[in-house]
Amino acid sequence: VAFDEYKVKPQKGDLFMTRIGDIGTCAIINSNDDLAYYVTLSLLRPNKRVLNSRFLKYVIESKYGKKELNRRILHTANPIKINLGDIPKIKLYLPSLQVQEYIVSILDKFDTLVNDIKSGLPKEIEERQKQYEYYRERLLSFKKS
């Protein structure tokens, strides 16, 4: 079967979101390569003029996003799932694109610090070293009598 026969092809910047089982886990598509995906995933294509893909990912994976998804889950299904038609019903607060990009830049930095052992761990060690030196100097600085 040729990819041309499919209605929707994933594009760079789109998101895959799990919709069966572990609902709401997202991945951003980083290339325009032809991809096939299974029914357990939904393809989300944000309107780039009003919605940043990374912002959408962070919102969906937040407590708020999980709560919104949970309101539309078919809890009687086994495994639990959300219907494709219910995904657009999720209520999202959309700040301006500029604010979204600012929020994403902050969250990306935290994500790197927490999840990237090559940059996060050395940065954490450096910060703890500074903290140690600060407290050492404070604790060992005695007033002259």
Predicted ranges, named:
Residues 1-145:
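Charged, alpha-helix-forming regions
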